[in-house]
């Protein structure tokens, strides 16, 4: 199958949450963002009577997961769709004991997909998780959006303080050439930045903003939260792993708005990765896990 690129984040913490409500019969775990199957594989390995539903829109990644999880084929079913679409179409003939959504982008997309997710690779700007779905690409955005649209996008979705500098540089560059690749865009951004050292690459926030916009990440999350809650069984848990403050704020505010006598927030503060996990899994540095339990049928 080739190398597995993605190490599941906060895996031990997810397992600990499952442990608090595990039932030996009929327990169903829904992995809304299956990826290469890391969380699901750990759950299936530890609990012999758990059944898993794995949801993954990218059919290339889904096939990699199926190969990795082949030994559990009798206890896992797959859905090749977006997680919000799955729950919109799902009929409530049964509810689920545990729903997990890891909102991070798979390492496969950064390292192999060739769609311009990473500024460390010289790839055509795209950033669509599933290009055949159509929709706007990062290439379209940086080459066609006007000044105000670009500034708002980069500032609001990336939290980029230097959004105006960056947009000015983008507009100047595209007077002469189209911005074709991720490395090309990264160079434009870096030249626009002040000549001082920063903790992160100057392109990080702009690339985040483009990816969020292209894949409708925040609105998809907002649509999904009430669907996830509605599909939990009594004492079921919804666990969500976020990777930036915009996602985390949406989840935090949604949980706070739930009726206290019907739901119990299990994470007064989000769970973050341990020092040890940060050492072997760099992707876990910004991960935050929030979880809520449903108290009624």
From Swiss-Prot:
Alphabetized InterPro entries for the sequence: RsmH, SAM-dep_MeTrfase_MraW_recog, SAM-dependent_MTases_sf
Residues noted as binding S-adenosyl-L-methionine in the record, renumbered to the chain: 37-39, 56, 87, 102, 109
Top-level taxon of the source organism: Bacteria
A molecular function GO annotation: rRNA (cytosine-N4-)-methyltransferase activity
Protein keywords: Cytoplasm, Methyltransferase, rRNA processing, S-adenosyl-L-methionine, Transferase
Protein's cellular compartments: Cytoplasm
NCBIfam families to which the protein is assigned, alphabetical: 16S rRNA (cytosine(1402)-N(4))-methyltransferase RsmH (TIGR00006)
Protein family per UniProt: Belongs to the methyltransferase superfamily. RsmH family.
Protein name per UniProt: Ribosomal RNA small subunit methyltransferase H
Species name: Borrelia recurrentis (strain A1)
């Amino acid at each position: 199958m080739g190398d597995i690129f993605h190490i599941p984040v906060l895996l031990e913490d997810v397992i600990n949450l499952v442990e608090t409500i595990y039932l030996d019969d009929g327990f169903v775990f829904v992995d809304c963002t299956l990826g290469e199957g890391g969380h699901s594989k750990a759950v299936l390995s530890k609990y012999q009577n758990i059944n898993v539903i794995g949801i993954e829109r990218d059919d290339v990644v889904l096939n990699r997961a199926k190969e990795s999880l082949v030994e559990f084929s009798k206890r896992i079913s797959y859905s090749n769709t977006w997680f919000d679409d799955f729950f919109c179409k799902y009929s409530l003939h049964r509810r689920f004991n545990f729903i997990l959504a890891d909102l991070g982008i798979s390492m496969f997309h950064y390292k192999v997909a060739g769609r311009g997710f990473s500024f460390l690779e010289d790839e055509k700007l795209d950033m669509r998780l599933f290009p055949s779905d159509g929709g706007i690409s990062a290439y379209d955005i940086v080459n066609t959006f006007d000044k105000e649209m670009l500034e708002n996008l980069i500032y609001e979705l990336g939290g980029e303080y230097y959004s105006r500098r960056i947009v000015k540089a983008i507009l100047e560059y595209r007077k002469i050439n189209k911005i074709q690749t991720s490395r090309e865009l990264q160079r434009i951004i870096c030249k626009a930045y002040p000549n001082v050292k920063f903790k992160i690459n100057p392109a990080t926030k702009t690339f985040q903003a483009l990816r969020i916009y292209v894949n409708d990440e925040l609105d998809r999350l907002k649509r999904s939260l009430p669907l996830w809650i509605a599909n939990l069984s009594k004492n079921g848990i919804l666990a969500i792993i976020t990777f930036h403050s915009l996602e985390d704020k949406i989840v935090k505010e949604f949980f706070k708005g739930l009726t206290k006598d019907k739901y119990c927030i299990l994470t007064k503060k989000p769970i973050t990765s341990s020092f040890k996990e940060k050492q072997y899994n760099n992707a876990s540095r910004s991960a935050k896990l929030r979880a809520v339990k449903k108290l009624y049928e």
